Amino acid sequence: MSDRQTQIPAGGGREDDHDDQVQSAGQVQVNTEGVDDLLDEIDGLLENNAEEFVRSYVQKGGE
């Protein structure tokens, strides 16, 4: 997975605040490293025990 960045524009009303707005316009960064590690772990488990995983999933009422 790739890291995603979302820019959130800062609002304002005065033109002389333009430089401050540009500097204070925030970016939200989502760290997906933990999610990638978890998905890698799940992939590893499925490679070794896919049949058992499916059986237990169906027994628990999964669709």
Swiss-Prot record:
Chain residue ranges for the region called Disordered: 1-28
Cross-link (Isoglutamyl lysine isopeptide (Glu-Lys) (interchain with K-? in acceptor proteins)): 63
GO process terms (BP): modification-dependent protein catabolic process; proteasomal protein catabolic process; protein pupylation
Region of interest: ARC ATPase binding: 19-57
Known pathway: Protein degradation; proteasomal Pup-dependent pathway
Single GO MF annotation: protein tag activity
Subunit structure: Strongly interacts with the proteasome-associated ATPase ARC through a hydrophobic interface; the interacting region of Pup lies in its C-terminal half. There is one Pup binding site per ARC hexamer ring.
Functional summary from the UniProt entry: Protein modifier that is covalently attached to lysine residues of substrate proteins, thereby targeting them for proteasomal degradation. The tagging system is termed pupylation.
Sequence similarity: Belongs to the prokaryotic ubiquitin-like protein family.
Name recorded for this polypeptide: Prokaryotic ubiquitin-like protein Pup
Gene: pup
